Amino acid sequence: MGDTWAQLPWPGPPHSALLLVFFLLAAGVMHSDAGTSCPVLCTCRNQVVDCSNQRLFSVPPDLPMDTRNLSLAHNRIAAVPPGYLTCYMELRVLDLRNNSLMELPPGLFLHAKRLAHLDLSYNNLSHVPADMFREAHGLVHIDLSHNPWLRRVHPQAFQGLVHLRDLDLSYGGLAFLSLEALEGLPGLVTLQIGGNPWVCGCTMEPLLKWLRNRIQRCTADSQLAECRGPPEVEGAPLFSLTEESFKACHLTLTLDDYLFIAFVGFVVSIASVATNFLLGITANCCHRWSKANEEEEI
């Protein structure tokens, strides 16, 4: 009897039980990997990494490689290291609003070819350099609003962003914006430029003319865009200016104007010669009169 039991095969676990064990082990490994790849103070779920409102002074060093949506909003981040986005090829949304950024490193978006939405509002950016968004050709929305120190946008800052639809430059420190910075954006639909200290001189005319020609396609916050100068148009709505407002920028001289200038020049020349002649005669007479008086005294 003992030998009979020894020869019988030991019953193995059911097939379904093996599958259950394998599933639990795999789930544990996946959970462990996800846990180690999610930065401290951040939450990671469904390719969304949320590190907002954590009082961070620097960006988290490691993110899940498949991150699509990254929020670093409402922190105290002052700088983003060069090449920070190099490994995150799936990134679609980057939210850096309400931080302390003064500038971004060159080539930050060089590998962010799928980035579509970028929020840099409420920072301390002072300028937008040339090729800042180089290779980020998928950008659809850029928010640069509420950067009070933003004084300059390079004419080639948005070069190559053919898919850009929404651009917010409101509430900055811009007094001038080059037409070249915008005319290379064929897909632009919404442009926000209100709340800036615009100087509505002759250099502003090309931009205004371009906006008027695109008014059906480009919505601008006309109620908030006002002129800060020159004094004669201070406080005037930017879009209330007409071609008549820039008439002085296109003053041209006619033939009659040139003839009048030539005539005035001729008269001034004759008057100058006559004046010099009279002064010479007067000086000569005074000299002779003085000499005659000296001879009489002798």
Swiss-Prot record:
UniProt-listed SUPFAM superfamilies? L domain-like
GO CC, sorted alphabetically, is: plasma membrane
Which stretches are LRR repeats? 66-87, 90-111, 114-135, 138-160, 163-186
Disulfide cysteine pairs (residue numbers): 38-44, 42-51, 200-227, 202-249
Residue ranges spanning the membrane: these are 259-279
Q: A Pfam family in this protein?
A: LRR_8
Q: Where is the LRRCT domain?
A: 196-251
Keywords, in A-Z order: Cell membrane, Disulfide bond, Ion channel, Ion transport, Leucine-rich repeat, Membrane, Repeat, Signal, Transmembrane, Transmembrane helix, Transport
Q: Where is the signal peptide?
A: 1-34
Instruction: Name where it's found.
Output: Cell membrane
Under the heading InterPro entries, the entry gives: Cys-rich_flank_reg_C, KCNMA1_auxiliary, Leu-rich_rpt, Leu-rich_rpt_typical-subtyp, LRR_dom_sf, LRRNT
Q: Which PROSITE patterns does this entry report, sorted A to Z?
A: LRR
Which GO BP terms apply? monoatomic ion transmembrane transport
Membrane topology per record? Single-pass membrane protein
Enumerate the spans annotated as LRRNT domain.
35-65
The answer on whether this UniProt entry bears the keyword Disulfide bond reads: yes
Name the domain of life this protein comes from.
Eukaryota
Q: How does it assemble?
A: Interacts with KCNMA1.
Q: What does this protein do?
A: Auxiliary protein of the large-conductance, voltage and calcium-activated potassium channel (BK alpha). Modulates gating properties by producing a marked shift in the BK channel's voltage dependence of activation in the hyperpolarizing direction, and in the absence of calcium.
Query: What free text does the record give on domains?
Result: The transmembrane domain is necessary for interaction with KCNMA1.
Under what name is this protein listed?
Leucine-rich repeat-containing protein 55
Please name the source species.
Answer: Mus musculus (Mouse)
